[in-house]
Amino acid sequence: MASTPSLLRLALLLLGAVGRAGPRPQGTTVSLSETVQKWREYRRQCQRFLTEAPLLATGLFCNRTFDDYACWPDGPPGSFVNVSCPWYLPWASSVLQGHVYRFCTAEGLWLHKDNSSLPWRDLSECEESKRGERNFPEEQLLSLYIIYTVGYALSFSALVIASAILVGFRHLHCTRNYIHLNLFASFILRALSVFIKDAALKWMYSTAAQQHQWDGLLSYQDSLGCRLVFLLMQYCVAANYYWLLVEGVYLYTLLAFSVFSEQRIFKLYLSIGWGVPLLFVIPWGIVKYLYEDEGCWTRNSNMNYWLIIRLPILFAIGVNFLIFIRVICIVVSKLKANLMCKTDIKCRLAKSTLTLIPLLGTHEVIFAFVMDEHARGTLRFIKLFTELSFTSFQGLMVAILYCFVNNEVQMEFRKCWERWRLEHLNIQRDCSMKPLKCPTSSVSSGATVGSSVYAATCQSSYS
C-alpha cells in the first residue's frame, strides 16, 4: 500500500500554497474537507468492489487492491493495468478521459519502484498540472518556500540583534529609535507568524496526509486554535504595513515641520501602528466566522470578504508611495539648493531612492493593485516571487539601514571600544607598578576618572 496518495498530496500542496500566497480565486470552490470526504466515499466503494467482484481464473495474477489513490482490479501477469482517474480529485472534471497505470509482472506481483517498497504508478494523465496556467509545478512552489523562509530567518535574526542594540545603548533612546523598535517588532512578529503558519500547514498538508490522519486533520482545521493562527498572521502582516506607514509619516513630518511635540505624536503613532489593524482584522475574522467558516480560513471563496483586509493595506501602501515621491522631491530641492553638480545630485538621489525603497516598502506598489483573482500563469508566479522574496528580506534591509550602518550606533560602539581600551590600559599600567608604590585604591580611582571623562564626553556629544 502506498504511504501517500500522490495526487491527493498535490491537491493538499495546492491548498497549502494558496494559504501561503494569499487569497484563492473566487471560482475555486473545492475545500480540503470536501476532498477528503470524497476520498472516503471512493475508498468505501472500492472496498465493496474488492469484496464483491468475481475472481479471475486460476493461475498467477496480481491481487486487487486499494493503494490510497486508486482502486485496482486483479491484473493478468505481464501486462499493464489501467483504471480511470479517481473522481474524488478536485480537478476530476478536467481529466475524465485520463487513466492511471500499473504493471503486473510475469510473477503475478505488482511492479515496484526501484529501491523502494512502493508500487510503480503512472499518474501523468491524471495530474492537475495538465490544466495549464493556474498552478505551478511543485518545484517552483518549493523554491519560493525556500527563498522566503531563508529571508524571514535572516530578517528575524538581524532584527533581534538590532533591537538589542537600540535598547542596550542608553544614548540611543529617543522617539525616532522608539519608532524603529516598533517597526522591528512588527517585522519580528510577522516572521514568527509566518513560521507558525508554515508549521501548521506542514502538519496539515504533509504529516497528517502521509499518516492518513484525516479525522485529526479535519478536526484541527475546524478548531479555534488553527483559525487563531491565521487570524494572528493577518494582524501581524497588517501591523507591519502600518508601522511602515508610521515611518513614512514620521520622516515626512521631520522634513516638512520644524516644530512638533514628539511625545504626543509618538502616542498617536502607537495607536496607528498597533491599533488601526485591529479595526479591520477583527471585523474580517467576524465575517469569516459568520459567512465563510470553512476549514482553517486559509482560502477565500468570496473575494469581497478578503477586501476587508486588503483595502486598508492598499491604503497604507498608497500613502507611503505618495510620501516616497514627496520626500524624493524635497531631497532634489535640497541638493539643488546646495549648488552641487549634476553628477553628484544624481548619485545622491539614487542613493536616497534605493535607501527609501525598503524603509517605506515602496516595492509593494509594483503588484499592489494586481488582485490575486486576476493574476494567472506567469504573471501570478512573478507576483508571488516578487512579493515573497522582497518582503521576506525587507526586515534584514531595515535592520541594516536603521541600525548596523547608522552613524550614531557606530559611534556608540566606537566609544565602548575606546572605554574598554582605556580601562584595559589603566589596568596593565597599574599592574606593572610596584605594589608598595601603587595602592589598590588607585586602580579604582584611575578607572573612575577615565569613566567619568568618557561619560562627560558622551553627554556633551548628545547635548
Swiss-Prot record:
Single GO biological process annotation from the record: cell surface receptor signaling pathway
Glycosylation sites: 63, 82, 115
Tissues in which the protein is found: Detected in pancreatic islets (at protein level). Detected in pancreatic islets and lungs.
Modified residues (ADP-ribosylarginine): 348
Cysteine-cysteine disulfides: 46-71, 62-104, 85-126, 226-296
Further remarks about this protein from its record: Selective recognition of glucagon-like peptide over glucagon is determined by residues located at the C-terminal end of the glucagon-like peptide.
Subunit structure: May form homodimers and heterodimers with GIPR.
Protein's UniProt name: Glucagon-like peptide 1 receptor
Organism field: Mus musculus
Higher taxonomy: Eukaryota, Metazoa, Chordata, Craniata, Vertebrata
Underlying gene: Glp1r
